[in-house]
């Protein structure tokens, strides 16, 4: 196992397997570790920005996530209410 320096200068763990027979160079990073390393680099870059730029970049993402969550919850609750109405009032559910 050895350490590799990334473009941002932080150290990431990279696993080295010397006994590969498939022609690769022996360096492997799992997809989860790759994603987490990417996320850490984005977080470091974002934390180095001024607050106004941080807010300008983060707020659209947060608002889009909140809007998507609201749409999913609205759909799920609407279907749940329809099912409850059918269960309690089977004769007048279609009106």
Curated annotation (Swiss-Prot):
It is a single-pass membrane protein. Keywords: Membrane, Transmembrane, Transmembrane helix. The chain crosses the membrane at residues 45-65. The keyword Membrane applies. The keyword Transmembrane helix applies. Its main location: membrane. GO terms for cellular component: membrane. It comes from the Bacteria. It is found in: Membrane. This is Uncharacterized protein ML0614.
